[in-house]
Structure formats: structure tokens, C-alpha cells
């Protein structure tokens, strides 16, 4: 029940955001209510997604899940859940600020407005990243002691990528606060890559006593892969065409 609600609530959240935009000037109250509703729905979706991801890594909790097959089991009582959830939400705010700056970097505005908007987006990114550092440390300290030790030097690969992510993330925060847009983008991409690998390392640690990747049998399905690539390329072509048409209309309207 709770899980399947993600899909309709995501659709409703998109509708609410459109209402917020369309009614921003004509009906400020409705616009604010729509924005608040969209935020609540998105927070709920994040809550369910984080609960599901946590459940995936904790086979010892699966018995409770199988006892409630209707989708009413929420794996949110684990000690890592709250910092994990906040880690997810705060990082979304940070990337949102960076996306805001990226949009205005390419938007045709006056130089003053464009630079001010980029600076504002970078400040949002920097502040959210500062909070993310605190939340990340909290999350790390809630992990089992053996996992912490692996990230603190016992596992060289895990330690290397965690350290790389922390250094690049801190660097991105500093460059964002000082208004260095392109450097911030590059450091953020490096941070994301390092943290994705770190996340994978943590998942392996959780599942190590229950499952090993080396136990899997590899059965390549080249036909399915080829079909996926064809559809991917076709989709990118369609999206590229849509963007081209949209930008051409915008330029004609501006002219």
C-alpha cells in the first residue's frame, strides 16, 4: 500500500508544481499550497525509497516483510534510517541549487541577473553541502563498528573512495561559496562518482554474510542489450529534437 503510492503521488506532485508555476501571480495562496503539497509528496517518496533501499541491505528484516506482503512494512526503525534519509534529502537540495545555477548559466538574461542567479544557486549548494558533511558523519557513526573500521583503513579501497568523496565534496563546497561555477561542477561529478562506489562498498559489507557477487552465474543477453541501446539512442534523438524545437520557438518569441 505505502510502496505503490509512490507512482500516483509522484504524478500529483508534478501537477502541483505546474499549478504553483501557473498560479504564482494570479493566486499566491493556491500557488503556495500547491508547492507545499508537492514538497510533502516528494519527501514521502524519498522516505519510501530510502526504506526500501535499507531493506534491500538487511536480509535479517526480510521475515518481517514477508509477514506483511501488502506493502505495509516500513523498515524505518533501524538506527541508520534517519541519517540515511537526511543524507538523501539534503543532497537533493544541494544538487537542486547546482541545477539552478546551471540553468541560468545557459539562459539568455542580462549579465547582472545571470551572475546573481548563478551565485544564488551556488550558495544554496554550498550551504546544503555543509549540512551534508555533518549528516554524512552522523550516518557513518551509526554504521556497525566493523563497517566503520573498514572505512577507516581496514579496507583500502573503501577508505580511498570515501576519502576521495569527502575531499572533492569539501572542495566543491569551497569553490561554490567563492562563485567558481565550472570547478564546482567538476568537483561535484567527482564526488558523485566516488560516493556511488562508496555506496556500493557499503552494500557489499551489509550483504557479505548472506551473498557474494562471485557466486552469480553470468549469462549474457546480447539481444536484450542491443534492443536497449537502440531504444536509448532513439529516445535521445527524440529528446534532442524536442529541445531543438523548443529553443527555436523561444528564440523566435524573444525576437
What are these regions (language model features)?
Residues 1-255:
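Polytopic transmembrane helical bundles with strong interfacial aromatic enrichment
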Amino acid at each position: 500500500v505505502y510502496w505503490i503510492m509512490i507512482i500516483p503521488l509522484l504524478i500529483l506532485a508534478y501537477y502541483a508544481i505546474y499549478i504553483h508555476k501557473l498560479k504564482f501571480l494570479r493566486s499566491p495562496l493556491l500557488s503556495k499550497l500547491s508547492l507545499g503539497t508537492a514538497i510533502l509528496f516528494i519527501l514521502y517518496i524519498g522516505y519510501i525509497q530510502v526504506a526500501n533501499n535499507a531493506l534491500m541491505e538487511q536480509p535479517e528484516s526480510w521475515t518481517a516483510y514477508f509477514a506483511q506482503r501488502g506493502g505495509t512494512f516500513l523498515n524505518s526503525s533501524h538506527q541508520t534510517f534517519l541519517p540515511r534519509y537526511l543524507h538523501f534529502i539534503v543532497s537533493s537540495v544541494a544538487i537542486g541549487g547546482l541545477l539552478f545555477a546551471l540553468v541560468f548559466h545557459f539562459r539568455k538574461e542580462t549579465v547582472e541577473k545571470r551572475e546573481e542567479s548563478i551565485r544564488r544557486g551556488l550558495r544554496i549548494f554550498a550551504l546544503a553541502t555543509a549540512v551534508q558533511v555533518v549528516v554524512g558523519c552522523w550516518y557513518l557513526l551509526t554504521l556497525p563498528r566493523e563497517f566503520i573500521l573498514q572505512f577507516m583503513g581496514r579496507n583500502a579501497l573503501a577508505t580511498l573512495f570515501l576519502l576521495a568523496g569527502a575531499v572533492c565534496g569539501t572542495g566543491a563546497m569551497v569553490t561554490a561559496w567563492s562563485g567558481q561555477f565550472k570547478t564546482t561542477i567538476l568537483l561535484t561529478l567527482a564526488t558523485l562518482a566516488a560516493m556511488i562506489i562508496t555506496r556500493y562498498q557499503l552494500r557489499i559489507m551489509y550483504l557479505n554474510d548472506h551473498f557474494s557477487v562471485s557466486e552469480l552465474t553470468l549469462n549474457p543477453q546480447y539481444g536484450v542489450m542491443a534492443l536497449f541501446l537502440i531504444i536509448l539512442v532513439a529516445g535521445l534523438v527524440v529528446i534532442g529534437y524536442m529541445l531543438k524545437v523548443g529553443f527555436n520557438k523561444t528564440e523566435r518569441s524573444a525576437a
